[in-house]
Amino acid sequence: MPCGEPVDIENPCRTTDGSAMLGRHRSRGSNRPPESLLSICFSSNTTAGQFTAHGQETDEEIRKSRARRGVNKSVRPEAAPDEDLLARERGKRRGMLLRGMTRPSRPILTRCFARAALVVAAALLGGDASLAADLDWRRLGSETTEVLADVIRIDTQNPPGGETAAANALARKLEAEGIRAEVFESSPGRGSLHARLPGSGGAPPVILLAHLDVVPADPRGWRFPPFSGALEHGYVYGRGALDAKGVAVVELMALVALKRSGQPIDRDVILLATADEETGGKAGAGWIVQHRPELLGNAEYLLTEGDHIHLAHGGRKVVQVAVAEKTPCWVKLIARGEGGHGSTPPAQTAVTRLIRALDKLRRYRTGVRLVRPVEEYFAALAPLEREPLRSKLAHLSEALEDPAFLAEFTRNPRQNALIRNTMTPTVLEGSPKTNVIPEDASAQLDCRLLPGERPAEFLALLREVIADETIRVETLLSFPASSSDSTSGLMAAIRKLAATDLGGAPVIPSVIPGFTDSHYFRDHGVASYGFVPFVLSEDDEKTVHGINERVSVENLRDGVRRLVALLRALSTR
Ligand SMILES: [Zn+2]
């Protein structure tokens, strides 16, 4: 439970007196904690797009420091460009026909080698070698890249969204493959897509979910315009490349690949490409669950965004699957007061009341609480670290009682967010004129609660801290947190994929500080998991919601292949 120690919410990661939070071990002011080891060790674990304001500052500082050192580019070697794609891209720029272009023929030996490699890859995947050999992954990868570039070019910035055009583009691709697709709107322009690839019916369906809306993109600072879908050095650039049009297109192409293989799995595979995730999903996934629940069939599992295969320093891969999420409790504080001319102010105005309330919140620090999924997450990561960190993560509850370790641990914004509720002031509104005192002034707070927290109790605490009955607290978005079983058949299938396709990479059930549309489906009884089969470095992750968002052609191709392997592994259980 929150302890109520006054602190600075502008800097939730500052070194603090841990004794107040945990009730023991007073820290000595003279002992400055050592440089955080965790923020280095866990740098690969940052979940893209879920940073607090503090995290953004940190990222900005890193960028500035890199610029000072003259390091502008990713140190990660870039994948070799796909020649076919580059040729097509050049063709597009020259205004040539986009489709049906003759491919340059490759030497027969290369083709034979490619076919042999596919058979070997299929064997490694533990699947049916003839099936995998029949699928032309290179061609599927090229098609995936083309479809993604086309969909990125459809501007679906939310607000207002306008996802129908993107949903229609995906529907055309599916129908060209003989897969029936339906596009429906929750309101004009807010379209979502549903498609269902029939299986042999031995097991309940699995849903692949991704959203088609994107966060706004200011073209300043981008290497290419954010809605160009440009291809350079083996990467597709554009808003939504990773979050989440790239995911939607890989999921769609997995249906296409399974259809082309002629060997259905034992489950129906349902694709949902939805509107409105970025502003809470009420006009997309939420609308579907409420108004079209029949589209979910009696699905057992759902896969969506949330986590992925992390590429840590030294090239080590760690598969993280989000099984639980923090939950949003977005609120608006509204202060009222007498309006008037700025030259003759009364003692109290709406603006001064609001500032006083925000200052009280700024001084308040929420308490540390280690919830079970978070404890299990760090315990699972422990074997990947060296001593003494390994033991501390394995027994995190005990370790956090040491104020020095707590300070070190919470210096990393993501780790800090995983052990407490957070409150981040974001939107401020007052008068539009310098010389006019407004009657209303408001502030929006992006609060995030740990799994198991009750929003009503949190709001009561918020009112208690503000201690001003004239300030109205309105809830903008709130729902209870949910989680999925980390020992399910789907998790077993992901472990099988990691063993056969990812060199035995460890599989870690994770908790993410942000939220996805998963909760709508968990509430409907579908076990939902945040896992995208892309291998992403920290540099890749930083492009989500940032500038130069991009996904590699290699990830698109391997993503489709891995997803097909995963669905087949799920099928054979
Ligand atoms: Zn997203």
Predicted regions mapped to residue ranges:
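Short, low-complexity, charge-dense intrinsically disordered segments
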Residues: 53-59, 81, 88-94, 105
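Bacterial N-terminal signal peptides that target proteins for export
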Residues: 100-117
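Bacterial N-terminal signal peptides
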Residues: 114-127
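Sec/Tat signal peptide C-region and signal peptidase I cleavage site
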Residues: 128-132
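Acidic/His- and Gly-rich active-site-bordering loop/insert found
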Residues: 133-241, 248, 258-267, 445
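Metal-dependent amide/peptide-bond hydrolase catalytic core
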Residues: 133-134, 307-317, 321-564, 568-573
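Acidic/histidine-rich catalytic neighborhood of metal-dependent amide-processing enzymes
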Residues: 235-236, 242-320
